[in-house]
């Protein structure tokens, strides 16, 4: 009984060369909900039962920061495009873990962390105020013997209101397990063809994209509200951002900003996969210079998807680590 769950599919590696749809997963089970995350952890696909439990039908509007895949008749086809859609289904249909089971799950990570010499780590996607509350959860796991320090980044849930989330208390920002910042998502992933890019994605024969140039999942008023909140609370603002089109937008929104943290960068751009030379030059002239975490693991782990998605020029220009290091103190 209960949910059938999985993770890790990449449609470019499947024999069918396409994303599974609800009809495919209905063959797994018609009476149990099925939920499969894509390899990028941004999108997912579910069966008809899961859609029914979440109340998602042709009249359900797309949520903020995501979209529901639909067939030619406007009916949901099972695709949950980007995190906004995934979170909608989780909030409306999936049961939350109990506090005890969540603590036990964290404690199981002890041997894994220690075997790799990891004593400090970061969770970039916690939902502050959820049940169980992340900070309480991680602190309890550490109290019971998990010997790891945790920096938690709370996903922004305040919308366009800079007071839309409660301010951090001083005790939440101190100690070996603490909140370290706020997380935003400006776009999707390159392998999933949802990162916001200037040049349209390549498509396979017969493939039709809902968003040929990806999708922005962040709007300026929301960004400015989160920026104001981070400044007021003295924490870092981290932005998931992959495509050059989304980088253009965020640089526009940051153009007049001043830094507010002294010891660490006030803003982090996570991934910055397609960062153009003119954008690097622009950043070099800004008062607030964001830091970069441009992980080159993606072209190795997902190179087939990147090859299938990007033009040769964009593929060869992705993750310009050397250019960033030479141009910026990043």
Region annotations inferred by a language model:
Residues 176-194, 288-299:
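Non-cysteine beta-strand/loop elements that form the S-adenosyl-L-methionine
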Residues 140-150, 170-176, 232-233, 255-265, ...:
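Secondary-structure transition/capping motifs at alpha-helix termini
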Residues 1-165, 184, 191-246, 265-266, ...:
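Divalent metal-binding segments
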Residues 265-276:
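Aromatic- and carboxylate-enriched substrate-binding clefts and catalytic-loop regions
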Residues 274-330:
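Active-site-adjacent C-terminal substructures of enzyme catalytic domains
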Residues 110, 139, 227, 251-255, ...:
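Generic hydrophobic alpha-helical scaffold/packing signal
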Residues 134-137, 162-168, 247-259, 281-282:
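Distinct, well-ordered alpha-helical segments
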């Amino acid at each position: 009984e209960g949910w059938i769950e999985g993770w890790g599919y990449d449609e470019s590696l499947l024999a069918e060369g396409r994303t599974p749809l609800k009809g495919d997963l209905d063959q797994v089970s018609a009476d149990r909900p099925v939920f499969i995350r894509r390899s990028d952890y941004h999108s997912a696909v579910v069966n008809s039962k899961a859609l029914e439990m979440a109340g998602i039908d042709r009249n359900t509007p797309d949520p903020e920061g995501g979209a529901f895949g639909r067939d030619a008749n406007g009916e949901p086809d099972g695709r949950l495009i980007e995190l906004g859609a995934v979170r909608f289904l989780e909030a409306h249909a999936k049961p939350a873990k109990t506090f005890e089971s969540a603590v036990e799950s964290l404690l199981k990570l002890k041997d894994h962390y220690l075997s790799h010499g990891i004593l400090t780590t970061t969770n970039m996607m916690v939902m502050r105020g959820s049940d169980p509350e992340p900070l309480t959860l991680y602190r309890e796991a550490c109290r019971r013997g998990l010997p790891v320090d945790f920096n938690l980044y709370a996903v922004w849930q305040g919308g366009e209101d800079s007071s839309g989330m409660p301010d951090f208390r001083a005790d939440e920002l101190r100690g070996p397990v603490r909140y370290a910042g706020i997380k935003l998502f400006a776009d999707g992933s390159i392998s999933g063809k949802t990162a916001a890019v200037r040049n349209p994605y390549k498509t396979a024969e017969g493939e039709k994209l809902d968003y040929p140039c990806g999708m922005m999942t962040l709007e300026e008023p929301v960004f400015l509200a989160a920026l104001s909140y981070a400044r007021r609370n003295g924490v870092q603002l981290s932005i998931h951002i992959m495509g050059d089109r989304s980088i253009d937008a965020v640089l526009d929104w940051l153009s007049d900003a001043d830094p507010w943290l002294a010891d660490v960068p006030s803003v982090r751009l996570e991934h910055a996969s397609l960062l153009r030379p003119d954008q690097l030059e622009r950043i070099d002239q800004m008062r607030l210079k964001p830091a970069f975490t441009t992980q080159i693991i993606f072209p190795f782990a997902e190179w087939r998807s990147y090859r299938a998605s990007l033009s040769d020029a964009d593929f060869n220009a992705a993750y310009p680590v050397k250019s960033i290091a030479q141009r910026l103190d990043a």
